[in-house]
Swiss-Prot record:
It holds the Pfam family Ribosomal_L31. GO terms for cellular component: ribonucleoprotein complex; ribosome. Zn(2+) binds at C16, C18, C37, C40. One of its GO terms (biological process) is translation. Gene3D superfamilies: Ribosomal protein L31. Binds the 23S rRNA. It comes from Oleidesulfovibrio alaskensis (strain ATCC BAA-1058 / DSM 17464 / G20). Binds 1 zinc ion per subunit. This is Large ribosomal subunit protein bL31.
Length: 69
């Protein structure tokens, strides 16, 4: 490996907006602030909402039906 081309790796602490702190490594710095983490993300907490795409698909098909004929 070449000398002096690799970034410095720090022991970092990810600090989430919800207050959760995670210890990891990073090249960005010693403290990295994030907006969302696994303890507050809706996918991991089970509080995700269902997005109804059926209406959107029907509107798309209706809008572009004239081009398929």
């Amino acid at each position: 490996m070449k000398d002096n081309i690799h970034p410095t790796v720090y022991k970092a602490k990810l600090v989430c907006a919800c207050g959760n702190e995670i210890d990891t490594t990073s090249t960005k710095g010693e403290v990295v602030n994030v907006e969302i983490c696994s303890s507050c993300h809706p996918f991991y907490t089970g509080k995700q909402r269902f997005v109804d795409t059926a209406g959107r698909i029907d509107r798309f098909r209706k809008k572009y039906a004239k081009f398929s004929k």
